[in-house]
């Protein structure tokens, strides 16, 4: 199907850190959308966008990119990407960022949605599932329009490790990962295939368990190696895939942190589940048939997210349905 031209689409990235900057680069180089890169630090988004613009002669893209400290310049965005907040440092879990990033995500989402009330919101700030819920509470949008990107990233990591283990092309591998974007995420080998062949027919349970564990700690492994900050190329690639779907004419089945209103027996929570994603946002949550052990793992992950939401409940207006898991 024909792609939309840059002039028909506008994406505003809230936060010009490593993930936000890498995402801006992917979007303009792929001629996906015009981009506004916003940050509170004066000069940072302007400098990054100038650097990206100076690559135009090499890359040949035609998208416009603007660096700004003014939310007014984000007006009329089709997609708002929440990338603001502090990144993980060695020894930190994603949940260590909870209180600080809640305040940041709530504020930037409210300000941006005020200028783009028809936008879809994609969250990449950690802890991802809780921050997706915070952004939804701040936005006032229908839940189908607010989501987090973690599932796409987690599945991509699982696919990469499987490809390395088997020596196959990663293009032939399709993985499914449910649950929170953290140590209790739930990779599903039964729903992971290589050219249609279930992973469970190609690897022993011991090898699969090792790959699952590495997937769960994939982000922490990068944090440890970098010593300062976390992953950004892979998260940016995952967010870009979601944005391309949201701006295009295709419907895709992707795992994202979506709002649940009874699916999988869970309510009033954002968590990684497979959804049908399109330019209309989350069209539908797809409920997979889970075995007892898989369902128990999913509920453990959900309770961890719920505990995080309970910690930050006092930071958000009590204008949404009561929580329940």
UniProtKB/Swiss-Prot annotation:
GO terms for cellular component: cytoplasm. It catalyses: (S)-malate + NAD(+) = oxaloacetate + NADH + H(+). Its EC number is 1.1.1.37. It comes from the Bacteria. HAMAP family: Malate_dehydrog_3. Catalyzes the reversible oxidation of malate to oxaloacetate. This is Malate dehydrogenase. It comes from Gloeobacter violaceus (strain ATCC 29082 / PCC 7421). The gene is mdh.
């Amino acid at each position: 199907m024909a792609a939309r031209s840059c002039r028909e689409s506008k994406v505003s990235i809230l936060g010009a850190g490593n993930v936000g900057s890498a995402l801006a680069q992917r979007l303009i180089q792929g001629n996906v959308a015009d981009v506004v890169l916003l940050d509170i630090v004066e000069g940072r988004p302007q400098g990054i966008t100038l650097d990206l613009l100076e690559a135009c002669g090499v890359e040949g893209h035609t998208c416009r990119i603007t660096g700004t400290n003014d939310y007014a310049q984000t007006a009329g965005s089709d997609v708002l990407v929440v990338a603001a907040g502090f990144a993980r440092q060695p020894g930190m879990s994603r949940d260590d960022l909870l209180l600080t990033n809640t305040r940041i995500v709530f504020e930037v989402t409210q300000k941006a949605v005020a200028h783009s009330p028809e936008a879809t919101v994609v969250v990449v700030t950690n802890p991802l599932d809780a921050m997706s819920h915070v952004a939804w509470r701040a936005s006032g949008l229908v839940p189908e329009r607010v989501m987090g990107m973690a599932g796409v990233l987690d599945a991509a990591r699982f696919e990469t490790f499987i490809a390395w283990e088997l020596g196959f092309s990663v293009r032939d591998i399709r993985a499914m990962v449910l649950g929170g974007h953290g140590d209790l995420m739930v990779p599903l080998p039964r729903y992971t295939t290589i050219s249609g062949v279930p992973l469970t027919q190609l690897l022993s349970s011991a090898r699969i368990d090792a790959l699952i564990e590495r997937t769960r700690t994939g982000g922490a492994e990068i944090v440890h190696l970098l010593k300062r900050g976390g992953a950004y190329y892979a998260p940016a690639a995952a967010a870009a895939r979601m944005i391309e779907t949201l701006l295009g004419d295709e419907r895709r089945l992707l795992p994202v942190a979506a709002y649940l209103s009874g699916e999988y027996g869970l309510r009033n929570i954002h968590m990684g589940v497979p959804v049908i994603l399109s330019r209309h946002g989350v069209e539908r949550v797809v409920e997979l048939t889970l075995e007892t052990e898989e369902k128990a793992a999913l509920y453990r992950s959900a309770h961890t997210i719920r505990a995080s939401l309970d910690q930050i409940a006092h930071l958000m207006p009590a204008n949404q349905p009561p929580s329940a898991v």
